[in-house]
Amino acid sequence: MDYRNFFTGRPTSEICRDLIGRPFYYQAGGEKIGGYIVESEAYLGIYDRAAHSYGGRRSHANEGLWRAGGTIYIYSQRQYVFFDIACQEEGNPQGVLIRAIEPVWGLDQMLKNRGGKDGVLLTNGPAKLMQAMGIKSRNWDLAPLADSPFVIDLTEKKPAKEIVASPRIGIVQADPAWAQAPLRYYVAGNPYVSGMKKRDWADDHGWL
C-alpha cells in the first residue's frame, strides 16, 4: 500500500473523509480482525486547539504526529488506547483518529476481546475498536503503517450513501471555532458510529 502518498499531498480533512468505507484490520497469527471504517476525525496540527500538537507541542508521547504521513500514532488515556495516523510531511504534525468501524472479520475474537459485549457496542468508539482488536498498549506507536500488522486497504472502498461532516466529539475545552469545526466524518445511518441513536439507524447501515 502506498500509505506515504495517501496520507500526504492534500488537506488532512480530505484524507480523513477518504478513509470512510476503507477496510481497516489487524492481522496477527494468521487471523484478520477488523471491518470498514465508518467514523474518523481530522486534527490539523499546531493551529488546531483540539490537536495534541497545538502550539507546537512536541514530546515523546505525541512524537508520532510529527513523523511522516503514514506513521502510526497511538496514544493512551487511562487504560484505553486510541489509533491515529500522521498526515502530511514530517514536521507538520497533523493526523486522523479512527473512531469506529463496522466489524466484518474476526467477530468471534472481537467478542472475546470485548468481554462478551456485542452488537454495536463491539466497535462503536475509538477505544472499543482497539479493545476489539486486542490492542492494549502503545507498542506500535511510531511504526510506519506499512511495516505493522495494521492494514488500511486502499484498493477497496465500500461506498456510503451519505458521509456527514460534524463537530468532533468531546472537544469542549478548545476555542469555539475549533470545537465546532466540522472535522468529524461518518456514514449517515450506520449503527456503529459512536453516539448514533437507534432511531437514526438505517436498515442498510448507510451503504449503497
UniProtKB/Swiss-Prot annotation:
Presence of keyword Protease: no
Annotated GO biological process: base-excision repair
Enzyme class: hydrolase
Keywords (A to Z) from UniProt: DNA damage, DNA repair, Hydrolase
MF (Gene Ontology): alkylbase DNA N-glycosylase activity; DNA binding
One Pfam family named in its UniProt record: Pur_DNA_glyco
E.C. designation(s): 3.2.2.-
Keyword Hydrolase: yes
PANTHER family assigned to the protein according to its UniProt record, in alphabetical order: DNA-3-METHYLADENINE GLYCOSYLASE
Stated family: Belongs to the DNA glycosylase MPG family.
Protein name: Putative 3-methyladenine DNA glycosylase
